[in-house]
Every structure is written in C-alpha cells, then in structure tokens.
Design a protein with these regions (language model features):
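Extended, histidine- and acidic-residue-enriched regions that form the cofactor-binding/catalytic faces
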Residues: 1-106, 112-231
Length: 231
C-alpha cells in the first residue's frame, strides 16, 4: 500500500505504522536521447510500483533528485552536490522522518555516483542516532536475472545504455527521443574495472564521462526495448 508523504495531511500520516522509503536519484546528462532526470524518474517509478504491490503500509518520502554527479560536468545541465553536503543534507532529511515517528527506512539509490554519500548517511544515522536504515541500488536486486534479459554483451548496459533506456521506454516513453539513438559498440573495460552496470568490479575509480564517449553515454541503447524494460 503506497502512501506519499507530501500528499498526506499531517495528522493522517501515521508514520509509526509504516515502512519509509526514500528514492535518491540525480540530475545529469543521459546522452542526447534521455532526459536529465532519468535516474530520478526510474527510481520513483520503481518505488511506486513496488509499494503499490506491498501488503504493508509504505510511506514514500519526497524524492531527492540531486545527487553526486561531478563526473558529468563536461556536459550540459548537470546539477550536483559535494559528498559532504549530500551526507549532511540527507541525514537531516532522514532524521526528520524518524522524529515524525518512522520506525525504519529503506533508501533506494538510482544513481551509482550517490553510493558513497548514501553509505555515509546510513553509517551516520546508525552510529549517531541508532536508526534502522537499509540502502539498496535497485539494479542490484535483479543482477542474478539480467543475463536472461539483456540482448547486449558486457559493456552494453552502462550509462544511458540498453538497461536504462529500456526502463525509460517502459515507464516514460514520451521522454525518450528514439530518433537520436545510434548504433554503438559495447563499452570496454579491464579485469579490474568495467563500466557495465552489472560488472563485478574489484576496484573503484573516478572517471569523467567525457572520457567514455562524445555524448556521455556508455553502452548500446539501440538494443533497448519497452518489452525488455517491462521484464
């Protein structure tokens, strides 16, 4: 059962008897065929869809649409936060929700660049306030099934690639400019680090996205489909 925090009258919130969910995305380029809010749009749709199917009361906090995205600064439209600012801000957001009576919170991350800051938020809420918080990147939940869904080889499901484009074609097709999608080879990596979203990387690196391609995309969006997104 989905209940949206910002669409509920304060006296009807009943936060004490709900699971709180916070979706955290970004505002950054997703090449020239997906909107700047792609990560946020996908996170919100996925949270709503899951909450509507849940038997428990799910209280959806106002979605956070600005994250850590300096690696996209070479392209137009990015709005980004420093990690320390993001940790401080989201800790306050979450602690406010707990003070309103929320007993537990799930943070759904829909942008890879947010992970370090969000881990900091979870650590701080747990160590300083004793709060129960779980953090998940939504794509990790289907990692064991993705090989039976994807059409591309490793390197095809990077930033604005087959995976994200398929989800956007499913959830918000009116925002996808399919005429601009061109045919590209899979992105390349090595044994230690690969830009595919489902790669099992052994190291972390900071890589500006203009080093991957001229439009900042990574992967093979031309293999995307709304049918794949629905799966």
């Amino acid at each position: 059962m989905l209940i949206q925090w910002d669409r509920t009258i304060a006296w009807d919130l009943d936060a004490e008897h709900a699971l709180g969910v916070l979706s955290v995305g970004s505002t950054e380029q997703h090449s020239n065929y997906l909107p700047l809010g792609t990560d946020s749009i996908l996170g919100q749709h996925l949270v709503r869809e899951a909450a509507e199917k849940a038997k428990a009361r799910v209280l959806m906090l106002p979605s956070q649409c600005i994250g850590f995205s300096p690696h996209h600064r070479a392209f137009p439209g990015v709005i980004t936060l420093r990690n320390d600012v993001m940790i401080e801000y989201l800790t306050e957001v979450c602690e406010s929700a707990f003070r309103a009576g929320l007993p537990r919170l799930l943070i759904v991350n829909s942008h890879g660049g947010n992970q370090t800051a969000l881990q900091g938020v979870v650590n701080r809420l747990g160590s300083e306030f004793g709060r129960q918080v779980v953090l998940v990147r939504y794509w990790d939940l289907i990692a064991d099934k993705i090989d039976g869904i994807r059409r591309s080889q490793p390197g095809g499901m990077g930033h604005a690639g087959e995976f994200e484009t398929s989800l956007m074609l499913h959830f918000a097709p009116e925002l996808v400019d399919t005429e601009r999608i061109d045919v590209r080879p899979p992105a390349k990596g090595d044994a230690w680090h690969h830009p595919d979203m489902f790669a099992k990387n052994r190291v972390y690196r900071y890589i500006p996205f203009d080093t991957y391609s001229d439009l900042g995309n990574v992967g093979q969006a031309h293999l995307a489909s709304k049918e794949e997104g629905a799966r």
